[in-house]
C-alpha cells in the first residue's frame, strides 16, 4: 500500500481511470456500456495490452473477462502468476460497435 492510499489520495493512474470512465472525446462513448480503463498494479513489471474491449468487457468494465480473459488466466497460471501481479489494458478503452475494427 502506497502513501497515497494510506491517506485516501488517488494515484495518478486512478485519476486517469476516473477520466476515462466519463470520457466523451470520440464517438465510441455513445455505444459503450462502460469504458474499460485497465486494472492491476501501476508498477507491474508485466503488462498485457489488447486492441479493444469486447462485449463482456464492455458490460463489466474490466479488461479480458471473456474467452480471451479465460485464456489469459490459464496462461498466467501456467507461469505461476495471477491477474493481481500484472497490469491489463487495451489500446482503446471503449468497445467499437459490433466489434468492428477501430478507426482512426
Regions found by a protein language model. Give the residues of each.
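A polyanion-binding, active-site-adjacent surface
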Residues: 2-104
